[in-house]
């Protein structure tokens, strides 16, 4: 009998002994980060950055394929017995010698996963991982001059870039309520002292919101720079309009943590949402994503980036109609129709197959 046949026979015997579980289930207990298993990671440390932000150090399993600076990773976290998926920018350099990766998370009001990771996550905790993805990255050929325009947690993908690639001429404008709210502030000021970065901090509690028109004074050559911008929708909307008006829109690269949502009339007032697989029915307005509606109702909803990019939330629409919060387009139920629940809201009564 060949060695392959012997291994196959031994595996079948193990399956008989371990039924109803599989041998792989026990292997997952012994070696959860092994190759061949679902991609997992182990939290090895949590380092506070500000009062409401922390860096989470993760050792990914053997199936991890690495990342490009600026990309994000979807992470599945068990919170109060429910697995929730979120997407966070990777803040570690690509060549970290110990093989670990970091994400830096800012806790947001009512954010189940962000608050869990910042305030409750412990070393040793296992999390699910997807492969890194995203196109908010620097080109292979380093730009001669770069501007980073960031606000709040929008600094996280840019910090991954700063740690990974040293540029000859890099300028950053970063907005935060107060100096103590600037994530990575000490590290940024070390880069400034080493003349690797020119930094302007806008403290919105005292300075007010950044007026994009101030760029002419803060960075006189901004229109000549390749710009990477990440932050709240208001900042990015203003930047896109400003760059477009000056004919240099192609030099602006943006990353949104939430989709841009259009405001519609009174006709889009929502409706009754039925989650047929779980038998739950709730009322929803016409502006709240069905993903949020389901989670609030206790329905286990697949999710990922929560901004309409990764398609991790796609779900069959069995009946009724929904509205795309980005475009206002109405989708009506018909056989085979899938919707993105993170960017779709009820447009009247609807039935979601969850």
Located regions from the model:
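Iron-sulfur (Fe-S) cluster-binding modules
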Residues: 1-35, 353
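FNR/FR-type flavoprotein reductase catalytic core
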Residues: 5, 115-279, 283
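Ferredoxin-reductase
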Residues: 26-133, 137, 144, 169, ...
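A short, compositionally biased
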Residues: 69-71, 265-271, 309-311
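A short, sequence-level motif marking secondary-structure junctions
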Residues: 90-94, 286-291, 328-332, 345-347
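Local cysteine-cluster metal-coordination motifs and their immediate loop/turn environment
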Residues: 157, 299-324, 334-348
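Short flanking/linker segments adjacent to small metal-binding domains or redox-active Cys/His motifs
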Residues: 205, 285, 348-354
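C-terminal accessory/binding modules appended to enzymatic or scaffolding proteins
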Residues: 268-305
């Amino acid at each position: 009998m060949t060695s392959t046949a012997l291994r196959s026979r031994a595996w079948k015997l193990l399956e008989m002994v371990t039924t109803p579980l599989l041998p792989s289930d026990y292997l997952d207990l012994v070696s959860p980060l092994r190759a061949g298993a679902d991609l997992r990671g182990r939290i090895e440390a949590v380092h506070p950055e500000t009062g409401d932000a922390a860096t989470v150090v993760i050792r990914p399993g053997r199936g991890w394929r690495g990342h490009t600076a600026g990309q994000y990773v979807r992470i599945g976290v068990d919170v109060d017995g429910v697995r929730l998926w979120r997407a966070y920018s990777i803040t570690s350099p690509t060549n970290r010698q110990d093989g670990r990766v970091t994400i830096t998370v800012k806790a947001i009001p009512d954010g189940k996963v962000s608050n869990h990771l910042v305030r409750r996550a412990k070393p040793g905790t296992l999390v699910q991982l997807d492969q890194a993805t995203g196109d908010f990255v620097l080109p292979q050929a380093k730009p001669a001059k770069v501007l980073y325009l960031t606000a709040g947690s929008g600094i996280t993908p840019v910090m991954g870039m700063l740690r990974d690639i040293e540029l000859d001429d890099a300028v950053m404008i970063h907005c935060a309520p107060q100096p103590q709210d600037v994530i990575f502030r000490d590290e940024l000021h070390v880069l400034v002292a080493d003349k690797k970065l020119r930094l302007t901090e806008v403290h919105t509690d005292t300075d007010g919101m950044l007026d994009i028109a101030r760029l002419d004074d803060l960075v006189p050559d901004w229109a000549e720079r390749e710009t990477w911008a990440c932050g709240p929708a208001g900042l990015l909307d203003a930047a896109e309009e400003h760059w477009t008006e000056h004919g240099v829109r192609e030099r602006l690269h943006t990353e949104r943590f939430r989709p841009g949502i259009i405001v519609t009339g009174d006709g889009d007032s929502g409706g009754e949402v039925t989650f047929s697989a779980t038998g739950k029915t709730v009322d929803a307005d016409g502006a709240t994503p069905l993903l949020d509606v389901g989670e609030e109702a206790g329905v286990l909803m697949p999710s990922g980036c929560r901004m309409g990019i990764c398609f991790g939330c796609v779900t069959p629409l069995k009946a009724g109609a929904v509205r795309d919060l980005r475009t206002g387009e109405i989708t009506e139920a018909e056989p085979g129709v899938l919707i993105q629940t993170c960017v779709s809201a009820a447009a009247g009564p609807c039935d979601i197959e969850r």
